[in-house]
Amino acid sequence: MSEVNISASDVRELREKTGAGMMDCKKALIETKGNLEEAVDFLRTKGLAAAAKKAGRVAAEGLTAAKVDGLTGVVVEINSETDFVARNEQFQNLVTNIANLAINVKDIEELKAAKMPNGKSVEEDVVENIATIGENLTLRRMEVLKVSEGAIGSYVHNEVASNLGKISVLVGLQSSAKDTAKLEALAKQIAVHVAGNNPQSIDDSGLDQALVERERKVFFEKSKEEGKPDNIIEKMVEGRIRKFFAEVVLLQQNFLFDNKLTVAEVIKNAAKELGAEIQITKFIRYELGEGIEQEEKNFADEVAAVMKG
């Protein structure tokens, strides 16, 4: 096969079109016999192949997003490998566009198939962004919240751009109150409270009973070790369980904006003022990377693994 003559100007043009390295551009032009368009496709394919390798790395950074449209809200989480990417405008636009679509779908599978503004599916667009951004990206989860009447409050903590940040919260208030502005303001305050206090459930009944029993057992054993008489251990355990509920149950927590009142008391006062019942139907709190286990390896372990392998 005869040597293909590749000009420096072709290499430069291909680099400008793709942002790929000089040597990669030269190799692509040689492989495609100097055809610039085919060389672009060659590099794109190569980029996507590299992205497939990146998929083995843990993506625990990134962004969460909250979007509200009337009486419907959605929270999404999209992960990257480094915090640096979260400040990348291209990644921020990707997350925003996905959140805008998520509000109209029912689950993550439907979201992956939804069409982005560029005509590609969400799943396809994420893969292309893996290639161009150069990190593994994962559309991890989404959840929709709806109320039939009332208000939805949203709050994003540590915002890096509009509605994008480390923690995203939605709170649904069901109410027939006519003053929607005050209802929305209350929903927003409760959303801020949820971000800061991280409740586990709205009320007692929503708590995982296995968790409650585990706490009860710990308190019981601790009281026994302290040498307390059996006749008062049960009272002490019940007192500690009540304190535990006050720490993790939303309605029993002291309100972030007025710690002399519980959230339940704040809602009761607002209902009286607005002349209609108010009920928290649901809250969603996404904290970036929660529950993702990051595998830690040191350099010596990595070398040993390669030598074995």
From Swiss-Prot:
InterPro entries: EF-Ts_dimer_sf (IPR036402), Transl_elong_EFTs/EF1B (IPR001816), Transl_elong_EFTs/EF1B_dimer (IPR014039), Transl_elong_Ts_CS (IPR018101), UBA-like_sf (IPR009060). It is found in: Cytoplasm. Keywords: Cytoplasm, Elongation factor, Protein biosynthesis. Its main location: cytoplasm. The keyword Protein biosynthesis applies. Belongs to the EF-Ts family. This is Elongation factor Ts.
